[in-house]
Amino acid sequence: MNLQDALCIRPGVTSVIGSGGKSTLLARLAEELRAKGATVALATTTHFMPFEGVATVTGHDVDEVRAALAAGGVACVAVPAEGPAGAAGKLGPGALAPAELARLADYVLVEADGSRRLPLKAHAAWEPVVPAGSTQSVLVVGASGFGQPVREAVHRPERFCELARCSPDDVATPDAVAAVIRAEGLASRVTVNQCEGEGALACARRLQALLDVPVAAGSLREGRLERLG
């Protein structure tokens, strides 16, 4: 199943939060939507790396955004980040808010969270940074974190342990991850990425059984998801 159908992505602003493949989801979903004839603006409220083959618009001129969308179908609207993130080549929030971009592009996909490249995370009080106008939040979970010690696989392990009632040395189970997702109540739907074996898929199915939001699982790198419920 393609990503749009598996995640029920609608026109307007969609926020991508969590860990384990947010930027990959933005890139693959944008390409999929572009291939269907839609225009897509990529944005962030935190930081992300530039997208290969996608024009980056750093100004606040809406005509420049329109031109980039007309030329390539997809435009990244962001500015070079400051400090260590900028030194690493990352981009930060652009001059045009996602709600403004929604008047220019059919779809606006926003990376609204950070995870320090770890497969799992819990959220601090100020996270995620979901922008005004966002109609849904897709939470990405990295299946590679299942079975790994919480202290090694989770961004903000102390918060994770508080919500899941576990210790940093415990392994991250689907039950613990589900407890955190339920307690936070941030997700409109969940995507379990890195499901490239029966063990990972079994963990995703267990997660789905414990949640009351739709769950899809598969490989974002391959552009493949299966809707579990």
Kindly give the residue locations of the regions a language model identified.
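Phosphate-binding/switch loop-helix module in NTP-utilizing enzymes
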Residues: V77-A122
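N-terminal phosphate/diphosphate-binding loop that engages ATP/GTP or pyrophosphate donors
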Residues: A30-P84
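Inter-motif core of Ras-like GTPase G domains
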Residues: A124-F146, A153-L163
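Canonical P-loop GTPase G-domain recognition
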Residues: C203-G229
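General beta-strand structural signal in soluble alpha/beta enzymes
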Residues: V16, V40-T44, C76-V79, V108-A112, ...
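Acidic, Ser/Thr-rich peripheral helices and adjacent loops at domain boundaries
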Residues: G59-E64, E152-D169
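Walker A (P-loop) phosphate-binding motif
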Residues: N2-K36
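G-domain G4 guanine-recognition motif of GTPases
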Residues: A112-D113, G142-S144, E162-I181, A187-A200, ...
